[in-house]
Regions:
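Active-site-proximal loop/helix of nucleotide/amide-processing enzymes and allied scaffolds
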Residues: 1-29, 34-36
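A short glycine/serine-rich beta->alpha loop
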Residues: 36-41, 107
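Active-site nucleophilic cysteine motif
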Residues: 41-58
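Extracytoplasmic copper-binding redox domains, predominantly the cupredoxin/blue-copper superfamily
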Residues: 61
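...with weaker cross-activation on analogous glycine-rich loops/strands in unrelated enzymes
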Residues: 67-137
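Glycine- and charge-enriched low-complexity intrinsically disordered segments
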Residues: 135-163
Length: 163
């Protein structure tokens, strides 16, 4: 299933899957998931997962605070981006390629993030949609940006990351 494949990719190890009702066994190996066009799965392939994976292409490892429930809704106390950006080693900065922008989209909390590309666009993974690159300089996402930050270990020169 898609969920098995995504969890296999998250673990980074080969999975053995057995279906006892038909006595079938198969193994799946982790794939390298492209940053653009990946399907959305909350707690796995979501906006923080994309930010983590993009930073990994630059040699920066981030902690995984993804959860599989809609933490940005008012019934949950979590405020994951607001609570973790500094703790993760990000510092506030002016927008530039490689910076992460944290946005507030249809919520009372900072609930979405993306990376500014070399072309000044936004690499992001919006809830329920495939990850994509969107214009950023003005418009919807720029208007919802709460803060622009850059990881302290991110080099000034961004390594190529598009497949």
């Amino acid at each position: 299933s898609d969920l098995d494949r995504q969890q296999c990719n998250n673990c980074g190890v080969v999975w053995g899957i057995y279906a006892p009702d038909c006595d079938e066994y198969t193994e799946i190996s982790p794939d390298s998931i492209p940053l653009i066009g990946r399907p959305f799965l909350l707690g796995s392939h979501d906006c923080w997962g994309l930010v983590m994976d993009w930073h990994a292409t630059q040699g920066v490892a981030l902690n995984d605070f993804r959860v599989d429930y809609p933490w940005w809704e008012s019934q949950y106390p979590d405020n994951l981006y607001f609570d973790n950006w500094e703790r993760e080693g990000f510092v506030e900065c002016a927008p530039a390629p490689g910076c992460m922008v944290i946005m507030q989209v249809e919520s009372d909390k900072w609930n979405h993030a993306g990376i500014i590309t070399d072309e000044g666009e936004l690499l992001h993974h919006l809830y329920g949609q495939p990850s994509c690159i969107t214009p950023y300089a003005r418009g919807y996402f720029k208007d919802r940006t709460m803060i622009c930050v850059r990881h302290k270990d991110l080099p000034q020169e961004i390594k190529p990351w598009r497949a």
